[in-house]
């Protein structure tokens, strides 16, 4: 076990940060532009994009010919990648929310989400209700205020009002814990997925990705903690999953592309991702789990 020690590093001024990078062998062509950039993007955030250029991970000395502008390009790529992913997730989230509310409410009534008899796990049911209650209490939406002025029972507004406020994570947990497997499968089939377990897996992974994008976290070479289920065969155009690292960006990008294909929006997402990768020659797609001939896979053609 390593020995804990006192943290002694002090804050550095921007000029000191620049001198530190230069002393480690980083080529900085324009110190004034570098200072402006580091005044807008913190050194601690940006250093993650410098790591691939390091020759020594202990001394943090850079490889020969390492350039500040290449790390900036990687940072900009990552920002555009997050934007692309987040916009796609928003479309998926709204569609999924619509399908769940519509199908479940038609089958089990407008208040199905707080019917304990429809839950697999009572403890998770209570957790979900507490989350929904907190989200409702925080809400400033006019439609909730109007509902409260006119109705006092049941305790929650109907699903199509309440679940418009629920986070994607809460919505996903409601779906996971819903006991009507036949109905869950019906929702999954509307996204061209064979079983609800596959949809549940993708929802979990998309929730992690969504949080990463929403908090502006590094994405490009990230190891995503929750891997989507990469089924060997799906009804639509798919990919060869052999050797695919399900915890990398490529895997979840495949799931998003397939999901969007089922809704008729996949081509736009795929073209934008291809264009983004082509625009940044400095970026190594293999660091994101992209196989060598990924663009030839049926899903991406």
Task: Show the residue positions of the predicted features.
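Extended intrinsically disordered or low-complexity regions, especially N/C-terminal cytosolic tails and loops
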Residues: 1-208, 220-301
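Acidic/aromatic/glycine-rich contiguous surface patches that form carbohydrate-binding/processing clefts
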Residues: 216
